[in-house]
């Protein structure tokens, strides 16, 4: 399959992964390896984490991003105290510490970063906000926190993906889907660049499509 210049295969994988021919090169082909690494890290000792921090001690930006992703709250607090601008630093893909803490599900780190001035509406190079990250990985508590702070529930990525569409495609994101569907300002019928709504995605990829009755005005009781 040939893609036009600048086409983002990650966006296609979120919506039409079943349509990509076997053998098509993926922009996320190391995901399984990364998952295995994450499992290994969860079993590491405190000494291991301290060694990892030592390796990054001369690069505060890298250390901040790493610490936010790995739930190292004390390290995040220390770095923010020494240089407040680090709460909005970015990696090469535009992910901020808030993005990383959001997709990793670290509520205390998320709250601290927001209290310290982290940009709630920061976008990656693909147009993802922290709410997109939390929704994609099914972290309902994080999504709830971001929404309470003012995150835009209908924000769209460069591929026109909404947080609802991302949650709709994840079988493990039931609570996140329920949360998003309960938002009064939600526009559940928005379509992505492939022309699909969140309901279409849920119908194809999960068993949660029945939840979309929540978003029908006639079923809402105020």
Q: What spans do the regions from the language model cover?
A:
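Intrinsically disordered, low-complexity regulatory regions that flank or link repeat-based scaffolds
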Residues: 1-58, 219-222
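Ankyrin repeat boundary/linker residues
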Residues: 57, 91, 124, 157, ...
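Ankyrin-repeat intra-repeat helix-capping/turn positions
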Residues: 71, 105, 138, 171-172, ...
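Ankyrin-repeat inter-repeat connecting loop/turn
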Residues: 87, 120, 153, 187-188
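Leucine-rich solenoid repeat scaffolds
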Residues: 181, 188-216
